Amino acid sequence: MGKIKNITKYCIKEFQQLWKKGAFYVFTGSFLTKFVVFFGSMFIVRVLTKNEYGQLTYMENLYGWIYIIAGLGLTNAILRYVVLAQDIQEKYNIFQYSIRESLKYNLVILLCFLGLNQIYPHPSSFENLQLLMSVMLIMMPFQYLLDSDLALERAMFNNKRYALLAFLSSVALIWTKFLGATVQGIFGVVCFGLASNLIFGIGFYVLARRKYFAGFKYSPPEKGLKKEIRIYSLQYMITNGIWTIFMLSDVFLLGKLCDDPTILAEYKVAYVWPGNLSIVCSAIGIFVGPYFVKNENNLSWVRTNYKKVLIGTLGLVFFVAGLMFIFAKPLILIYAGKSYISVAPLLQLLTISAFINNGLRYTTANILAAMGQIKYNMIVSIVGIVLQVGINCIMIPRFGAYGVAYTSMGVYLFMAIALFVVFQRKYGK
């Protein structure tokens, strides 16, 4: 009884400390944001035909590939260098530098890919989407501005405000997309999504300047700091980009090797629930990241809190993943209806894969990146993506979407073990 009492007191104490630091707002905001996106997409999948939903999935996948290099990763610099800045003027200079430089890069990227879209050989089932793909591409600079606005709120440790703004922008985005789907199908989804990102990206930027930097004038950072920011951002972009490729290459290869919109639609539906396991780990990662940045030189603090975060994340993800695995069929019925019930076994396999990814890999990768150890993430990610693409090219023709699930389980486990070994060598006793 004494041990149980001590453990209970310890848990209550830790919870109270997290509450004071704003963890509640981050967790609640992240959960509500993901829930709104999920709940809204449930209506979109029911409004569109299976063929239309497959086409939308194809376009969003291509857009995701391009968004990897958006802003050359400068949003990540906000999360690190605004935190490390000594005064409000320096914070403003870094934030404004990131915004201005990312806008320049995004305009160049946009023009290049608008031209490339005109000559890209889309599969025959998707050839009629060329114009609509161009409209979707125009959304990129505004979406990136919105991401930068939200990154600033995290860097300023204003967790309550971050949660509120993230929730509001997500509600607006998903419901405008749903409205567009009911009015004009996938064309409406794309156009209304563009309008939402434009309004909130610019609107939140104006609000941020008034909130934190009213009366301050921009002064460019020193040359050495600029170089450091660019290098860090580029490394983070490459690392994140490689990881994003894990998410995107599955759909891309399915589209290329199968050339069937219905297969893409079924895979997307099966992945929705496992994909939302990231709610748990991303909420924790959003909250703890800045604290690991501030204490990155305190090895004892890093080791102690890494264990807490890893165990807590693993336990929560295991619990949620277990429920998803058990109730696979009801979850499919809730989200997409009887026409997709056959993908329940695929959902179960993807849930196992998502548990390995979110429960084992993500925490270590996120903390290493926050403390500037990006190169290790990059190396592990490069090896992982080579394995994934190579194995998928063998597995997809034989097993279809199930081949993707089998591949993901093995590759994610390899990456989780590799990153854990790196962390122990850098920060372990």
Where are these regions (language model features)?
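Signature of the first transmembrane helix
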Residues: Q17-N76, M139, I174, L234-L257, ...
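Hydrophobic alpha-helical transmembrane segments
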Residues: Q130, S134, A163-Y212, I382-L387, ...
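Membrane-water interface segments that mark the loop-to-transmembrane alpha-helix transition
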Residues: K21-T33, M59, G64, I68, ...
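Membrane-interface junctions at transmembrane-helix termini in multi-pass inner-membrane proteins
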Residues: F142-L165, V293, A354-V380
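Interfacial segments at transmembrane-helix termini and the short loops linking adjacent helices
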Residues: F15, W19, K50, Q118-M136, ...
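Helix-loop junctions and terminal segments of transmembrane helices
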Residues: G71-D87, A155, Y212-F213, P274-L299, ...
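Transmembrane helical elements of multi-pass membrane transporters/channels
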Residues: G22-S41, A166-L173, V189-A208, K223-P290, ...
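Interhelical loop/hinge segments that connect adjacent transmembrane helices in multipass membrane
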Residues: G2-W19, L129, K160, F187, ...
